[in-house]
Amino acid sequence: RYDVAEPSRLVPDVAKSWRVSDDGRTFSFELRPGLKFASGNPLTAEDVAWSLQRAVLLDKTPAFILTQFGFSKANVTERIKDSGTLALSIQTDKPYAPTLVFNCLTANVAGIVDKKLVLSKETGGDLGYAWLKTNYAGSGPMKLREWRANEVVALERNDNYWGPKSKVSRVIYRHVKEAATQRLMLEKGDADIARNLTPTDLDALAK
């Protein structure tokens, strides 16, 4: 992930260390031990490799972020693979700038998901794609509690997160189209933050 204080620097979450081969094609990673998904399942190199393979196999629009490195449905299981509980390697088709590869691995399409959980929700060979549209299988500091299209997204603290725990236990994003309604929610204390308020609303709130 990006360092908020210094966006040009990447900060590892799942990875403990990594190295690039002399020919610039093989990226080897060692994972942090003891990681868990929000479900409580252990996060292993198998999950990481499978998540990246899954993105290529599904071949949805964002997959080009990974397939630009020569991965295809035919070769991805050989080019991206785990070599133990905490080790995996990624082999590209030719040398690329490590910064490019690492930045692409921070993209949403390269997000690591819980293989065991996602496959238990698979329908019709979709690798859990339909289920993940409205559910969560990650390992970040917050987890999805509820999602209703054009209505609400509710997140809550993931107590299985390896790093510093979130200082807030829950965050709720509500889809409120009218600026006047947003202003009313702020005034009543039903919302802490609003966006797209009109100048009139802002002036009223400032009084």
Residue positions per predicted region:
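Surface-exposed binding/hinge segments that line
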Residues: R19, E30, A49, F64-K121
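N-terminal lobe/hinge region of extracytoplasmic solute-binding protein
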Residues: R1-D22, Q53, K60, T134-P141
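Sec-exported extracytoplasmic/periplasmic mature domains
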Residues: R1-V4, K36, Q53-K60, P95, ...
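Short, well-ordered beta-strand elements
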Residues: K16, T26-S28, V48-L52, A87-I90, ...
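Ligand-site clamp/hinge motif
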Residues: A130, N158-A204
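Extracytoplasmic/secreted proteins, especially bacterial periplasmic and envelope-associated proteins
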Residues: R9, D13, E30, L43, ...
